[in-house]
Amino acid sequence: MRLGISTALKHTTPKEWAEKMELLGCKAVVFPVDCTASDLLVADYMNEAKKHDLLIAEVGIWKNVFAVNPKEREEAREYARRQLRLADEIGAVCCVNVAGTFGGPIWDGGYPENFSTEAWSELVSYTKKLIDEVRPHRVKYSIEPMPWMYPTGPDEYLRLEKDINREEFGIHFDFVNMIN
């Protein structure tokens, strides 16, 4: 088992990042740059990860792909596509996002609409579309469980996996989020 933390810590170079992770005893890490980084910078981080035996556990999206504002929603979806492509290119274990919110302005907020039948259907439909469009080969796309949006626990996660029915969809089992 590899242990890690969910932050890249403050650093100025890929080498400093990798050394800090190693010093903490981390062997699983979140990727510290996103799809807007240059190919050279991404390669530098990957080289340092390899030198220090760091597994890229996840590439985060952390955007509301169901935002009420159409412009914000499309920007979030484009970012999700680009992040999933990046995660696949670097061989991350997963590319993760929360389901998103359906009832208000806070991207990860708790709203009653988050538990509607429509929210479930939209989540399943969107996830299928994202996977089918990007067609990742090396990474699993996953949804972070949260107590105030789907999935909230193992039963919903299993149902979500069944309904999405894509080999490229994986389970991001964050049990702390299920109980907090």
PLM segments and residue spans:
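N-terminal small/glycine-rich loop or linker at the start of catalytic domains
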Residues: M1-G4, A57-F66, T101-G110
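Hydrophobic faces of well-ordered beta-strands that scaffold small-molecule active sites
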Residues: R2-T7, V29-F31, I56-I61, C95-N97, ...
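A short, Lys/Arg-enriched amphipathic alpha-helix followed by its capping loop at the start of a domain
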Residues: L3, K20-K27
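Acidic-and-aromatic substrate-binding clefts and catalytic sites of carbohydrate-active enzymes
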Residues: T7-K15, F31-A43, V65-K71, G103, ...
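Accessory recognition modules or surfaces
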Residues: K27-A28, Y45
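Aromatic-lined substrate-binding rim segments of carbohydrate-active enzymes
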Residues: D39-D53, E58
